[in-house]
Amino acid sequence: MAFFIASSPHLRSKRSTADVMRWVLACALPGLIAQTYFFGYGTLIQLLLAISVAVALEAGIMLLRKRSPISALRDYSAVVTAWLLAVAIPPLSPWWVVVIGLIFAIVIAKHLYGGLGQNPFNPAMIAYVVLLISFPVQMTSWMAPIKLTAEPSSLVDSFSLIFGGFDSDGLSLQQIRTGIDGITMATPLDAFKTSLKAGHTMSETLTQPQFSGFAGIGWEWVNIAYLLGGLILLKLRIIRWHIPMAMLAGLVFTALLAQLFAPGTTASPMIHLLSGATMLGAFFIATDPVSASTTDKGRLIYGFFIGAMVFLIRSWGGFPDGVAFAVLLANMCVPLIDYYTKPRTYGH
């Protein structure tokens, strides 16, 4: 009698890597739509540019490695990396920002370590941190939500600002940002931290135009949209609940502790949950199966650590949002976390 010999794993999921990546992209659509609605066409332009550059880089690297570029592109991992970076940067950033970021993400953070499944760090977050440290002005040049601007940038103006540096009136992005009276161009997290450091109370800070009833205008709905997409991923079992729930719990827990011991010195848990890249990070970034912890207990520790670090960086760090730094710090700790949380082998 003949038996087939195959290497592990012997229990396989019916979903391929490409299926998982396509579902991630589909569930990220609500967040993309919300970002485009509140912050303009720049997000869509950045996304199309990022996908084009990522596909070209992925194909080029695979050819250099003497492997099939078609098979690599079919798993959609490069598209997911491009998507995450495109929605993380300011919509009207210069075109070369996303190009440089994707070179670091695809070439260095992914293929330098061996390609898909071998990278110890999240490629999109590596790219984001490199860009933020190297080009802080371009990476923090966020426009106010469309709702707060009298003349939002049109599709043509957005295209001109990204690829030419000036709009149809000859104004640069920085000139446009400083030309809007009475509205700070800082994100809600940055505005909140700056206002508190200036000695203003929390109630005074929340009266600024970019804040609405419970968080920053636009940002709250963007986070709710990513939360909706993340819940769909959970329902479909594309991701597991441990990391996103632990991350949100870590963020809320540390924010509540700060409110308890130093009231009025930090933002409330609600503002932290619905500002910045909280939901995008919890459901679409931290859950990266390659760079995240692999045990159930480890995922809880990993997620909680990210949430706590996000709060610490947001409150006392030098950058307004801390999701990217928190994820990369947690990626560094994954081998240690997995070592001490690996399940006991039966019989030992």
From Swiss-Prot:
The cellular component terms of Gene Ontology attached to this UniProt record, alphabetical and capped at eight, are: plasma membrane
FMN phosphoryl threonine PTM positions read T187
The keyword Transmembrane belongs to this UniProt entry's keyword annotation: yes
Provide the E.C. number(s) assigned to this enzyme.
7.-.-.-
User: Principal localization?
Assistant: membrane
- GO annotations under biological process? electron transport chain; transmembrane transport
Q: Summarize the protein's role.
A: Part of a membrane-bound complex that couples electron transfer with translocation of ions across the membrane.
Name of the protein in question: Ion-translocating oxidoreductase complex subunit D
| Underlying gene | rnfD
